[in-house]
Amino acid sequence: MSLAIVYSRARVGVEAPAVTVETHLANGLPALTLVGLPETAVKESKDRVRSAILNSGFEFPARRITLNLAPADLPKDGGRFDLAIALGILAASGQIPAVSLAQVECLGELALSGAIRSVQGVLPAALAARAAGRALLVPLANAEEACLASGLTVIAVEHLLQAVAHFAGRTVLEPYGASGLLRESMPYPDLSDVQGQLSAKRALVIAAAGSHNLLFTGPPGTGKTLLASRLPGLLPPLNEQEALEVAAIQSVASHVPLKCWPQRPFRQPHHSASGPALVGGGSKPQPGEITLAHHGVLFLDELPEFDRKVLEVLREPMESGFIVIARARDRMRFPARFQLVAAMNPCPCGYLGEPTGRCRCTPEHIQRYRNKLSGPLLDRIDLHLTVARETTSLNPPLASGDTTANAAGLVAAARERQLQRQGCANAFLDLPGVRTQCRLSDMDNSWLEAACERMTLSLRAAHRLLKVARTLADLEQAHNIERKHLAEALQYRPFSG
């Protein structure tokens, strides 16, 4: 048969659109033509495939070979199509039966010797192959990752000879059995490591229970970074769908095998990070820090030291849970449902309000420092907390109830109430959801309106305050929001919202 079709997958953002590799052999002068909008790395695959086929002991057909990567309008890059191209040529030349390739998708880069090398973005391709009802042929190094798509038949190969023997029926490979190494997660740091700071720990529990954004303000050395690093351990475990989304992003963005799955990500970019580094971008858009923090925590230390323009691009993803990057050729959408935790000093030197009087910053310097953060950005942060310096104690006694396990139990119970009631965390309630789930008595409503007027809170800040109060009620397993919940929620709002 002079025509063969092999299925593969491209990599576009965190998605894996289907690519059909069509191979046709015709009479004429020997030549190999590759069409279908291939980029440089794909064009170079012609030479890799020829050498791999010959060095594996197979015949490279001395005919006019046309390879079409369909659809033609989808850009293709990388060496992920090498294996599919080689199998297509062998099937079209009759060296393996073409019918054996009908229910399999192939991914893998070929070495000149015929060895099959790993590729990036295998998990999105595995999920797409499972949805299409086909098996997936992958390099052995990617097999564990592909097996995360439960129910998918994964065939792992190390060399082109193995793949050909399998499809020719000489040595049929059994589906790969995952060893489960990827399902081991690293332990989170414990909350008991933080000395004192009871109010800050309370704010962490509230933030975890309702998925609220959090801002710590305080002098250096008070434990702001230490506190933020404890938040992922308080969050509920990822469900299977969330874990697969996180793993798919890591699969696309990382050049190393997946580790620590399922684990909530904790990202801490440096304050010199650019806009594309934070939200994603480039000529070929890549996921940024907010996407890498999907279903996890994005920690911005020294918040005012970030470029103001960089911080402003966070506003839309904080509301929508995704980021759209537009380029001349296409638009790419990346998920970005992250929980923001930020830390900052109260002034440029960091010691404003210290009893020692070390601060020498002028009011103008302090105002200029705080003006680096816009009102709309601060409005989107639900919990604002000042972290004061505690009495120095090098070996404090551990509080028995001050552990991550105890706090995580409270958070899990509150989250369960929210999921049963409205299907999402309180922070993600839309306006109709706020009106339905955050109802107040007439007296409490009037009291809250008066408080918001005195504190000059915006309507958005008032709605976020109601969500925090709803979370406080859930932590106490209370059905209705009470005055004490509103009063505590007000404590976490700055006076100029």
Predicted segments with their positions:
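Residues immediately C-terminal
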Residues: 112, 298-299, 305-306, 392
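Walker B catalytic acidic pair
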Residues: 295, 301-302, 313
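Peripheral, non-AAA+ core regions of ATP-driven protein-machinery
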Residues: 1-215, 219-226, 326, 462, ...
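Conserved catalytic network of the ASCE P-loop NTPase/AAA+ motor domain
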Residues: 26, 57-60, 97-99, 129-131, ...
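Walker A/P-loop
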Residues: 215-258, 320
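Basic, amphipathic alpha-helical bundle interface domains used for macromolecular binding and assembly
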Residues: 35-46, 61, 68-78, 285, ...
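Conserved alpha-helical scaffold flanking the Walker A/P-loop in AAA+ ATPase domains
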Residues: 205, 259-265, 270-298, 330-331
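The Walker A (P-loop) glycine that initiates the GxxxxGKT/S ATP-binding motif of P-loop NTPases
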Residues: 218, 280, 302
